[in-house]
């Protein structure tokens, strides 16, 4: 009887350890906690080329091989203002680990206002301009802020509508599972 008890206990412990070590489960749990909606089927993120604040053009392909947080925002959006500092802190913490943040401003013809905004909040990640909102339409953005998570393979991993605490422990764990 004692041998059976020890066997059952050992088996239970092994099952618990296996479940705890399941990275896919941890990935799903972090997505749920952050409010990330995964796609039904992973598909390549639509590529685009936009002007950056310094006048250069960048395309999404320029960031291939990195985990990307693609964020759509505007200077007039209150929740965007709330989340951008947290995105900067995330960028500073995880850039060396292959996480890139690309912020797409949908402000119309307000390049100087966007520049002033970026300076005010000391944002150092790439900011691109989509004044005609073609990229916004290609990504079906209905409200701001909206963010897409793109894996190192260039495929859409999920999207988030609304502001998030991007520098939270849960967020950092989520990006860690995406980069590995």
Task: Label every model-predicted segment.
Residues 9-18:
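Bacterial N-terminal signal peptides
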Residues 98-111, 125-132:
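Thiol-based oxidoreductase modules, predominantly thioredoxin-like and allied folds used
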Residues 20-47:
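N-proximal helix/coil linker or "cap" segments that precede and/or mark the start of modular domains
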Residues 42, 47-68:
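A short beta-strand-turn-helix
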Residues 72-89:
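Conserved redox-active cysteine motifs that mediate thiol-disulfide chemistry
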Residues 66-68, 72-76, 143:
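Short pre-active-site segment immediately N-terminal to redox-active cysteine/selenocysteine motifs
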Residues 116-124, 130-177:
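Thiol/disulfide oxidoreductase modules built on the thioredoxin-like
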Residues 1-10:
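Bacterial N-terminal signal peptides that target proteins for export
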């Amino acid at each position: 009887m004692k041998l059976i008890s020890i066997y059952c206990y050992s088996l239970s412990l092994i099952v618990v350890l296996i479940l705890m070590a399941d990275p896919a489960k941890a990935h799903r749990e972090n997505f749920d906690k952050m409010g990330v909606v995964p796609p039904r089927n992973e598909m390549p993120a639509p590529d685009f080329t936009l002007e950056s604040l310094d006048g250069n053009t960048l395309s999404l392909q320029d960031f291939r091989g990195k985990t990307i947080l693609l964020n759509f925002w505007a200077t007039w959006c209150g929740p965007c203002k709330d989340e951008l500092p947290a995105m900067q802190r995330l960028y500073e913490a995880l850039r060396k680990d292959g996480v890139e943040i690309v912020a797409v401003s949908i402000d119309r013809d307000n390049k100087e206002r966007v520049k002033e905004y970026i300076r005010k909040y000391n944002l150092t990640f790439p900011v691109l301009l989509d004044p005609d909102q073609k990229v916004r339409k290609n990504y079906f953005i209905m409200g701001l802020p909206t963010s897409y998570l793109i894996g190192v393979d260039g495929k859409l991993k999920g999207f988030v509508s609304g502001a998030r605490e991007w520098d939270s422990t849960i967020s950092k764990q989520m990006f860690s599972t995406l980069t590995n």
